[in-house]
Structures are given as structure tokens and as C-alpha cells.
Amino acid sequence: MSDMAMIRIGILIAGLLLVAAIFLFGRPKKSPQGRRVDKDEGQPRERREPVISSEFGVEDDAAERAEGVEQSELNLEGQDASGGNEVGKRPNQDFDKIVSLFVAAKAGQVLRGEDVVVAAEKTGLVFGHMNVFHRLVEGHPERGPIFSMASILKPGSFDMANIREMQTPAIAFFLTLPAPMTALDAWEKMLPTVQRMAELLDGVVLDDSRNALGRQRVAHIRDELRAYDRQHQAPPLTKSPRW
């Protein structure tokens, strides 16, 4: 299996778990499940985290489960998820749509933590809530993030104390809707940032299906977000009828 194929499988598993973790964190944790339950029993499958090898490929057991991986809560290993930093925290944890992109290292390479941090600062991202990076509304950080960026490797956060030792095959960018602006405007903020990050890190931009992001896919996402905005726009005000 090629390095890019392994990266895509890793993103498939870790990306889903990461997004769910960031927005489900803080809810009561479910009791750990001690065994894998057969589908015939009609019980939920055991939740397992992806196992990433030292070469940043997904090991066989996780690869076999890639197709059926669930969006489950990711264990943050007991650390304070916010690190005492509320910058980039969503004022409302409810969401109904997530749009994600990835910047992956080229075959045989990795993204170094120190380089990721420098690139993030150059593109206007700020370090904050959940120990990940966020793009905020200028002058209104209290409105929450326009989009966020995290590592695809467990636990997804950036440990600044050990950032020089950090390496990851890819980073994830996710736009969670509703956002502090229209969905289309938020996308137009995220896309050039992701593309610039890829340039700075000498990486490649992948879509949510782990394929190279192309013009056709970009156009399709824009159409989806226009439709989302139409569905969620406030109804027009009507005058009260005169009797």
C-alpha cells in the first residue's frame, strides 16, 4: 500500500474521531466497553481509536475498520482540553453540518509541529480552545471560530511544550455550521488559508473524501453552502395585515 493511501486511511479514521471529539467534549463520558459485540446481537460496536504506526500509516486492525468507523468521543488523556484558554470556543456547541479539508504531507514526508505553528501564525490562525488553532472574526472573538485546525493524530491538539518533537502526516481544517457568518463566507475564509498552509508546508490539499481538492469539488462545495445559507436565512419580515 502506498504512503498516500495509508495517509488517506489515517485521515478517514482520525479525522472523523477528531471532529466528533472537539464538539462532543464536555458531555458525560460513556462507560468504556470491554469487548467487541457482534452485529447479530443488535448492540453498538465497541469504539476503538485508530492505531497509527511509527511510519504514520494505519496498522492492519484499524485499516480493516476504516469503512465502519463511528464518530465517537476521543479520549484526551485527562488533560484540560481548553488549557485554560477560551479563545476560539464556540458559544453554542450545537451544529448541523461540518465541512472539512486536509493538508497532508507528500509521500515519504511528515509535517513537523514547529513548521505547522509558524505557518498557522503566518496565515492568521490563533492558538486557543482545545489546544488547537482557530480563525476568528476580526474584532469579535467572542462569536467563536470561523473554522479550526487540528492534527489528525490522537489527541488532535498541539502540545506547545513539545512542539519541536511533534510530527503528523496531516492536519485537519473543519468549518462547523452554523458559523459566526454565512456558510459561504466562512468557506471563502477557510479555502485560501488551507491552500496557503499547503504552500508553506509543501503539502497537498485533500477534500473530505481524501482526494486531491480540485475545481469541480470546490464548485460543488460552494453550491452546497449556498443552499445551506438559503435554508437557514431568516424569513422575511411581513407587515401586519390591516383590518
From Swiss-Prot:
Gene Ontology CC terms, in alphabetical order: cell division site; plasma membrane
Keywords: Cell cycle, Cell division, Cell inner membrane, Cell membrane, Membrane, Transmembrane, Transmembrane helix
Coiled-coil blocks: none
Periplasmic topological intervals: 1-4
Pfam families, alphabetized: ZipA_C (PF04354)
UniProt-listed Gene3D superfamilies: ZipA, C-terminal FtsZ-binding domain
Source superkingdom: Bacteria
Biased composition (Basic and acidic residues): 35-50
Topology Cytoplasmic: residue spans: 26-243
UniProt-annotated stretches for the region Disordered: 30-89
Regions crossing the membrane: 5-25
Membrane topology: Single-pass type I membrane protein
Subunit note: Interacts with FtsZ via their C-terminal domains.
Family: Belongs to the ZipA family.
HAMAP family, alphabetized: ZipA (MF_00509)
Name of the protein: Cell division protein ZipA
Species: Xanthomonas euvesicatoria pv. vesicatoria (strain 85-10) (Xanthomonas campestris pv. vesicatoria)
Upper taxonomic lineage: Bacteria, Pseudomonadati, Pseudomonadota, Gammaproteobacteria, Lysobacterales
